[in-house]
């Protein structure tokens, strides 16, 4: 008989953060945790085929198992290339 585990699912926007606590069966996956959280219904901008996910800042797959106390994170896509932004800042400070 499988026991229950408690997992948090997080999704952060610049203006608002979502943190949902869900109870699942042992052996549940990252995808099951996200679906149980209700965030897919709250935020239509989340697309599990495009958004990357992780557990405590470490990349994870939707099929990975979650454990009691885990925090599943849904990441937003990057809007700009970090390398390009650093290059632009370096050029700007060099021109001062």
UniProtKB/Swiss-Prot annotation:
Source domain of life: Bacteria
SUPFAM superfamilies listed in its UniProt record: MoaD/ThiS (SSF54285)
Transmembrane feature ranges: none
Annotated source species: Shigella flexneri
Similarity comment: family membership: Belongs to the UPF0125 (RnfH) family.
InterPro entries: Mopterin_synth/thiamin_S_b (IPR016155), RnfH (IPR005346), RnfH_sf (IPR037021)
Protein name, UniProt field: Protein RnfH
Pfam short name (any one): Ub-RnfH
Gene3D superfamilies per record: RnfH-like
């Amino acid at each position: 008989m499988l026991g229950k585990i408690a997992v948090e699912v997080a999704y952060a926007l610049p203006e608002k953060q979502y943190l949902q606590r869900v109870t699942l069966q042992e052996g549940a996956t990252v995808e099951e945790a996200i679906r149980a959280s209700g965030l897919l219904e709250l935020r239509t901008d989340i697309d599990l085929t495009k958004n990357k996910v992780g557990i405590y800042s470490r990349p994870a797959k939707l099929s990975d198992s979650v454990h009691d106390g885990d925090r599943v994170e849904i990441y937003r896509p990057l809007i700009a290339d970090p390398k390009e932004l650093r290059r632009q800042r370096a050029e700007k400070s060099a021109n001062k």
